[in-house]
Design a protein with these regions (language model features):
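Beta-strand-loop-alpha-helix segment that lines the small-molecule cofactor/substrate pocket
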Residues: 68-70, 75, 81-82, 86-134, ...
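Predominantly a Rossmann-like dinucleotide-binding segment in NAD(P)-dependent oxidoreductases
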Residues: 11, 122-127, 132-242
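N-terminal Rossmann-like dinucleotide-binding module
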Residues: 1-53
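C-terminal helical cap and adjacent loop that interface with cofactors, partners, or active-site loops
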Residues: 18, 271-280, 284-289, 295-410
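Glycine-rich phosphate/pyrophosphate-binding beta-alpha loops
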Residues: 262-272
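Active-site beta-strand termini and strand-to-loop segments that position acidic
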Residues: 250-256, 280
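Conserved SAM-binding strand-loop segment of SAM-dependent methyltransferases
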Residues: 57-63
Length: 410
């Protein structure tokens, strides 16, 4: 593909506008030629941002099909509401427009099957933009795993633990899709931040696969009580019910014998964490306190606080296992979004496009990680019964080559 990528953005809410400002307009190898959102004020805001950052004028649309037809961009960032990610991506793929699709859950298995089918048919480049796969903790743990330092991996865990009550309750005013999802669905609705890095570490879809899923949800009272406590701010939500359980725990099994535990925790008071954890026969990694622990580091210790104090940020001792991107990170890269991982994922996307390389987070990854929303919804509805996990590779997982996103000295 050409050295200068003609880029477009569909979906200009908080995430889309943030990536436009933080990453896309700053790249020498990309030019944002068009933007689209159903809300015209968001379109105008984005056009101003492009003009102020680059001095160039892009074209704004409220109909993404019209934009794709008239502008014929080389690539598109899909960052609209969750419900429309796949629909827009399929339309772009069929037109030969490379797709960078933002994260979220899905709504049916057929939706994912169709996405995979269209990408396989068109061979149009597609990357699932799970930025947490590029974060410092996740890449450190992956490289320690690849070096054999943790021994054989047995279990991984992760969470999306983020107090989103104000964002959800403000959904009408801010036109945010989370409100309707939390009112009417009960599932693991945002699994990919924790599941993506775990799946890559376990080589899911490339020598390993998920085989079953069990999910249970707590009662849903966090949002209702939050609305009551802030009734003057959210009068339209007073008395409204929310289907989404306050905590959802999901357990997955793997063909390789590993287990994976996920937690969705977004409607009760708390601080942010992803709780990324890797357990092996020779040690473990815990991202919350950046702990690297190897067998024998500490003897039998019953004072848990003492052990945490001794091992706190011990991951810093293993900087040689960080990929080059993190060892040489600049302030500009850190400021591009989420401490650097947004820059790294888009750098990968554009590099793969220009060099005609396979995307490291592909359509099979997208389908596998997104389908957790649907499967968890089914399992919760069945009282926590196990449900089989579909294989979107149609058996190719046995022999597909694996590719990590950020290896040492890559």
């Amino acid at each position: 593909m050409k050295e200068k990528i003609r880029m477009s953005v569909i979906g200009l809410g908080q995430r889309g506008l943030g990536l436009l400002r933080g990453v896309l307009v700053k790249r020498d190898d990309a030019e944002v030629v068009a933007v689209c959102d159903v809300y015209s004020d968001r379109v105008e805001q984005s056009l101003v941002a492009i003009r102020e950052a680059t001095g160039k004028t892009a074209v704004g649309y409220t109909d993404y099909r019209e934009m794709l037809e008239k502008e014929r961009p080389d690539a598109v960032l899909v960052s609209a509401a969750w419900e429309y990610h796949t629909e827009i991506a399929v339309e772009a793929l069929e037109r030969g427009v490379a797709v960078a699709m933002e994260v979220g859950g899905c709504y049916s298995e057929d939706e994912m099957r169709n996405l995979v089918r269209v990408q396989e048919k068109t061979h149009t480049p597609f990357m699932f933009m799970e930025n947490c796969c590029y974060d410092k903790a996740e890449t450190l743990a992956t490289n320690l795993t690849r070096a054999g330092r943790f021994g054989e991996i047995v279990h991984c865990a992760g969470a999306y633990a983020h107090d989103l009550r104000s964002e959800i309750a403000g959904g009408e005013e801010n036109r945010h899709y989370r409100l309707r999802n939390y009112r009417y669905r009960n599932c693991e609705n945002y699994a990919t931040h924790e599941l993506g890095p775990i799946a890559k570490l376990l080589k899911i879809n490339a020598g390993n696969r998920f085989t079953s899923l069990v999910s249970v949800a707590s009662k849903a009272v966090g949002m209702e009580q939050y609305v009551l406590q802030n009734a003057e701010k959210y009068p339209n939500l007073v008395g409204k019910k929310f289907a989404q359980g306050d905590l959802v725990h999901t357990l997955l099994t793997c063909a390789g014998g590993e287990t994976v535990l996920l937690r969705l925790d977004t409607t009760l008071p708390r601080f942010y964490e992803r709780d990324f954890t890797v357990r092996g026969t020779r040690g473990f990694y815990s991202a919350n306190c950046d702990i690297v622990f190897f067998d024998g580091d500490i003897g039998e210790e019953f004072d848990t606080k003492k052990a945490y104090r001794e091992l706190f940020v011990s991951g810093e001792r293993y900087a040689e296992y960080l990929p080059e991107q993190w060892r040489s990170i600049t302030p500009e890269t850190r400021n591009a979004g989420h401490g650097g991982m947004d820059y790294f994922e888009f750098d990968e996307f554009f590099t793969c496009l220009k060099e005609n390389r396979a995307m490291p987070l592909d359509v099979y990854d997208a389908a596998t990680w997104m389908i957790v929303s649907v499967l968890s919804e089914q399992s919760i509805r069945l009282g926590g019964a196990p449900v089989p996990f579909p294989d979107f590779t149609n058996g190719k997982w046995l022999n597909r080559p694996h590719r990590d996103v950020c290896l040492i000295n890559r």
